[in-house]
Swiss-Prot record:
Its EC number is 7.-.-.-. The complex is composed of six subunits: RnfA, RnfB, RnfC, RnfD, RnfE and RnfG. The chain crosses the membrane at residues 9-29. This is Ion-translocating oxidoreductase complex subunit G. GO terms for cellular component: plasma membrane. It is a single-pass membrane protein. Keywords: Cell inner membrane, Cell membrane, Electron transport, Flavoprotein, FMN, Membrane, Phosphoprotein, Translocase, Transmembrane, Transmembrane helix, Transport.
Length: 209
């Protein structure tokens, strides 16, 4: 009986070892593909907020980590720098609207360094379906209204919903959500105006992590 038990134990051990080996090989083979797909998806998102024709650098390779209250939280946010012939011309900045109706709204804001917004996309939110979710480009084109708009200083009153004297449509039954996004985009564009002199001092993405 002991011989039989040993045989079963050996079989199980061999099976476990072979399964582990197969899993390791599969992971090794699929990891590059998954990583490549993630990079492609990231590039597609970046292209939606910073048009590719504006720069000739590899925007994905120039990524920095920034922290600033203007970005909506104390957490680190990433910023991707776009350069034309070596000169920084625009950036895609991760930002947070902390005051959404159902919690924080994560954004990717593209802008030049003179206050012009190039594009905005929502990357994560928990807003109410049918109301606040109109910030998603797959549901509404509302988020594209930011394209090409200028932020003319911190006190630019146009950056508000129309019912508060601004130039942006609010949603029927939902004002908090668009207000939160508008304010976050405005703060992000203003922050990016201050960024160029700091670029050489920023920590690259992946450093000290």
């Amino acid at each position: 009986m002991m011989t039989t038990m040993r045989r079963h134990a050996t079989t199980l051990a061999l099976f476990a070892a072979s399964t582990t080996a197969v899993t390791a090989v599969v992971n090794m083979l699929t990891e590059p593909t998954i990583s490549h797909q993630a990079m492609l998806q990231q590039k597609m998102l970046l292209d939606q907020v910073v048009p590719a024709e504006l720069y000739n650098s590899d925007i994905q390779k120039e990524c920095y980590v920034v922290t600033n209250p203007a970005l909506g939280s104390s957490a680190p946010h990433r910023v991707f720098i776009a350069r034309q012939n070596g000169e920084p011309v625009a950036a895609a900045l991760e930002s947070t609207a902390p005051d959404g109706y159902s919690g924080a709204i994560r954004l990717l804001v593209g802008a030049d360094f003179h206050g012009k917004v190039l594009g905005v996309r929502v990357t994560e939110h928990h807003e109410t379906p049918g109301l606040g979710d109109k910030i998603e480009v797959r549901i509404s084109d509302w988020i594209t209204r930011f394209n090409g708009l200028m932020v003319q200083g911190e006190h630019d009153a146009r950056w508000a919903v129309k019912k508060e004297g601004g130039m942006f449509d609010q949603f029927t039954g939902a004002t908090i959500t668009p207000r939160a996004v508008i304010n976050s985009v405005k703060r992000s564009a203003l922050y990016l105006q201050t960024l160029p002199p700091q670029i050489n001092t920023l920590s690259a993405c992946g450093e000290n992590q």
